[in-house]
Amino acid sequence: MRLASLLLSLFAASAFAAEPERPNIVFCFADDWGRYAGAYAKIDGRPSLNQVIKTPNIDRIAGEGAIFRHAFVTAPSCTPCRSSLLSGQYFFRTHMGAILNGAKWDSSIPTYPLMLRDAGYHIGKSHKVWSPGTPADAPYGGQKYGYEKAGRKYNNFSENATEMVKAGATFADAKAKLLAEVSGNFQAFLADRKDGKPFCYWFGPTLTHRTYEKHSGVNLWGINPDELKGKLPAFLPDVPEVRDDVADYMGESQAWDAGVGVIIAELEKRGELDKTVFVISGDHGMPGVPAGKCNLYDHGTNVALIVRGPGIKSGRIIDDFVNLMDLAPTFLELGGVQPPAVMTGRSIVPLLKSAQAGQIDASRTWVVTGRERHVGSAREGNLPYPHRALRTKEFLYIRNFAEERWPMGSPKFTSRADLPKFEDLEKVTYTAFADMDASPTKAWVVHHFDDPQYKWVYDHAFGKRPAEELYDLAKDPDQIKNVAADPAYAATLKQMSGQLLTTLKQVEDPRVGPSPVKFELPPFTQPGK
């Protein structure tokens, strides 16, 4: 009997030893950060902001891991994007998680952090995970897993650093003080780890979300706005006011990179970096500018995705189309957990473990993106701006389901006589076009609404849009010339429209289901309740 027990114990021990070690997972996810890193300059293939920005820490992870060319969010709005990512499903399948203002989490929806927790992972988070919405950060287990006692001032980097410098500190000292919060919060999380458990940590600062200290790009980081000449996308006016605003955003992005560097350094110091799958991304494109946040153009939906970790061959550029909802099943697979059938995302572990670069999975040649409602009062009746898009390597097709509505919200003015003040448009989002954040760029474009040279920029940013949009990306990478009505593209239009609607029906998008569509009714149109 003793011999049998001994043999059973030895068998169990050997079986346990044979199990592959589960990696740690660190997810660095910045608010309102699109695809801005030096590592992407070689991918852009044309003059871009990535030729100017300095992101040595993000670039290091890209060089030691894999960088994705075609990574997209399911929705270019904070809460819906995060609902999708955490649940591994399209945003429109997450009920009240599909909107921003008024979002409520349905606890019956499985999420990867809580599933990893139940599988033995030590989980934790710092700063923004799922917000705005109630209960706060519910898909991550609420504030129980929050680590922020070292401070939150890093989230408003430019404002706080500028204040310290004005008080007599050097920028180096101000930067070090703010970055000490990042390390302190991460160290507190690691200190709570028990019995060598694998850990799953979410680092989600909001410094790249507006507002920024004006001129901080040049004053703190030495980013000369004139260096951006000829490097802005075509739909952004290449004028001093806009270049200065974009330089400020780039400064916050460089502060984000510095925070990522702190996390890397702490892992290295503890000998954990090579045991960790390290992922970097953002929840949508640049805020407060035309075609960015809240838009289905690439400037709003195409984001950075960079992954380093054990078994991931370094130095690869991956061309497969991926959606950030694919990360939930990916993290679960890495943690040895079977993704639930309800997840519509597909694990990218096969792409990460492949030795190939370029196109790896022949089926990954497109993604679907979309949006319903962002802020509550952008349009009368708190109505959404419903649209969906199909993106392939060659084309972007957009279906606007309510072309009579204003895509960025109501103008709230009719002529120069009642035009809002520049300062109000610069600082108060709800002044006009409330689905675009307040910014100097927004104010400049609105104030040039009747300027013959820039009227097209204003119309492209804020004007009503036709039911269908189609862009030929080889000829029009900035997606300015809509060719949906061009007979030469009739076959492409039909094919992409059909593929989009078929896909939406397959994944049970309410927008193409029975009428009335729930997103047009309470509680979705009651953001305050």
What does each model-found stretch correspond to?
Residues D472:
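A contiguous binding-surface segment within folded domains or other stable secondary-structure elements
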Residues R2-L3, F11, F16-E469, P477-G498, ...:
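Formylglycine-dependent sulfatase
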Residues K505-E508:
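Short arginine-rich
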